[in-house]
Curated annotation (Swiss-Prot):
<dbReference type="GO" id="GO:0005886">
    <property type="term" value="C:plasma membrane"/>
</dbReference>
<comment type="pathway">
    <text>Protein modification; lipoprotein biosynthesis (diacylglyceryl transfer).</text>
</comment>
<keyword id="KW-1133">Transmembrane helix</keyword>
<dbReference type="GO" id="GO:0042158">
    <property type="term" value="P:lipoprotein biosynthetic process"/>
</dbReference>
<dbReference type="GO" id="GO:0008961">
    <property type="term" value="F:phosphatidylglycerol-prolipoprotein diacylglyceryl transferase activity"/>
</dbReference>
<feature type="transmembrane region" description="Helical">
    <location>
        <begin position="202"/>
        <end position="222"/>
    </location>
</feature>
<feature type="transmembrane region" description="Helical">
    <location>
        <begin position="17"/>
        <end position="37"/>
    </location>
</feature>
<feature type="transmembrane region" description="Helical">
    <location>
        <begin position="90"/>
        <end position="110"/>
    </location>
</feature>
<protein>
    <recommendedName>
        <fullName>Phosphatidylglycerol--prolipoprotein diacylglyceryl transferase</fullName>
        <ecNumber>2.5.1.145</ecNumber>
    </recommendedName>
</protein>
<comment type="similarity">
    <text>Belongs to the Lgt family.</text>
</comment>
<feature type="binding site">
    <location>
        <position position="138"/>
    </location>
    <ligand>
        <name>a 1,2-diacyl-sn-glycero-3-phospho-(1'-sn-glycerol)</name>
    </ligand>
</feature>
<keyword id="KW-0997">Cell inner membrane</keyword>
<keyword id="KW-0808">Transferase</keyword>
<feature type="transmembrane region" description="Helical">
    <location>
        <begin position="174"/>
        <end position="194"/>
    </location>
</feature>
<keyword id="KW-0472">Membrane</keyword>
<feature type="transmembrane region" description="Helical">
    <location>
        <begin position="230"/>
        <end position="250"/>
    </location>
</feature>
<dbReference type="InterPro" id="IPR001640">
    <property type="entry name" value="Lgt"/>
</dbReference>
Length: 272
């Protein structure tokens, strides 16, 4: 069994001001996205560092607003009905990937209109930069002792640990680390490699949807469902899995469509 490091969830103390690791990870995620996207401008015609800075700003707004609103609508709508002001109490925690994803999609529409880029040109460009942010977010969850995994059933399992925030004090899967490695690091490597060569428009975005969909669906088997949600469908599917299925199906269709149309935005096959 592993020992939980029990890191102080507050990274920086400045008098009454406290900066939590989870918030710091969001900042690092946006900085990583900016750095990676800036590097990608060297390989793509028609992209500049100013465009990337604006793109990351729009994306950050989409993540924060969409993530919070999505969490409230998907997971805590009853609490919102009881106290609508709770929506704005972001310091109490609660962000949804699926809500953040939708928020980014909407934000990208405004950015595309400003810079005269198509939606999928933009998504294909930025998609490989996203998994590092997902990885850092899950590390933030781990440090905060939240969203831990299900109880370990095998007493000889070497990677289980007891989280101080778990009222039952059971040996659990460190599912945040599993997700950081699969939805974050592994997906980043796959997308970065795939996008390093010219691909049809929509193909990179499609691979992101499929890759995240598969990784999240599998990781949900290790993650403890929210106490007020439990298993929603068939006695074993969680809310996270239900929300991920459409992403996977849309990604499959997009990949098929991309290779049917074969529209290239860069490289020797670029369409004029």
């Amino acid at each position: 069994m592993l020992t939980y490091p029990n890191i102080d969830p507050v990274a920086i103390h400045l008098g009454p001001l406290q900066v939590h690791w989870y918030g710091l990870m969001y900042l690092l995620a946006f900085l990583c996205a900016w750095g990676l996207a800036s590097y990608r401008t060297k390989q793509r015609d028609g992209w500049t560092s100013d465009m990337v800075s604006d793109l990351v700003f729009y994306g950050a707004l989409g993540v924060v607003l969409g993530g919070r609103i999505g969490y409230v609508l998907f997971y805590e709508f009853d609490k919102f009905l009881e106290n609508p002001i709770w929506l704005f109490q972001v310091w109490t925690g609660g962000m949804s990937f699926h809500g953040g994803f939708l928020g980014v999609m909407i934000a990208m529409l405004f950015w595309c209109k400003k810079y005269q880029k198509t939606w999928f040109q933009t998504l294909d460009f930025i998609a490989p930069c996203v998994p590092t942010g997902l990885m850092l977010g899950r590390i933030g969850n781990f440090i905060g002792g939240e969203l831990y995994g299900r109880a370990v059933t095998d007493p000889n399992y070497p990677f289980g640990m007891i989280f101080p925030t778990d009222p039952l004090h059971l040996v659990r899967h460190p599912s945040q680390i599993y997700q950081a490695l699969c939805e974050g690091l592994l997906l980043f490597i796959i997308l970065w490699w795939f996008s390093s060569k010219p691909r049809p428009r929509m193909a990179v975005s499609a691979l992101f949807l499929m890759g995240y969909g598969v990784a999240r669906f599998v990781m949900e088997f290790f993650r403890q469902p929210d106490a007020d949600q439990g298993f929603i469908l068939f006695g074993w599917m969680t809310k996270g899995q239900i929300l991920t299925v459409p992403m996977l199906l849309i990604g499959l269709w997009m990949m098929w469509y991309a290779y049917q149309k074969k529209i290239y935005d860069w490289g020797p096959q670029k369409n004029s």
